[in-house]
Amino acid sequence: MKKTFTGVVVSDKADKTVSVKVERRFAHPLYGKVVTRSHKYAAHDENNEYKIGDRVEIIAVRPISKTKTWKVTKLIERPRGIETTLAETEVAGGEA
């Protein structure tokens, strides 16, 4: 069984690649405080379909490049309230 994580896309600038931030929470072994740790994974996005803010699931795959060993398997949720992206605003004439 391959390892899977759920995270949020934090960058989609590269071609066929997205950066996915995965957060994990755990209780500190000595003090008991809940600690949050995060890690960014470079994940393969074949069709450039995932955008910043999307919650996605990634799965471990064979190495695709030097830093890419993860692939986006599915979209879990898109952020609400963001109707236009920066690129759409620039095409429309820069009026926001």
UniProtKB/Swiss-Prot annotation:
Coiled coil: none
CDD domains registered for this protein in UniProt: Ribosomal_uS17 (cd00364)
MF GO annotations: rRNA binding; structural constituent of ribosome
Alphabetized InterPro entries for the sequence: NA-bd_OB-fold (IPR012340), Ribosomal_uS17 (IPR000266), Ribosomal_uS17_bact/chlr (IPR019984)
GO-annotated cellular components: cytosolic small ribosomal subunit
Keyword Ribosomal protein appears in the UniProt entry: yes
Keywords assigned: Ribonucleoprotein, Ribosomal protein, RNA-binding, rRNA-binding
Origin superkingdom: Bacteria
Name by which UniProt lists this protein: Small ribosomal subunit protein uS17
Source organism: Deinococcus radiodurans (strain ATCC 13939 / DSM 20539 / JCM 16871 / CCUG 27074 / LMG 4051 / NBRC 15346 / NCIMB 9279 / VKM B-1422 / R1)
Protein encoded by which gene: rpsQ
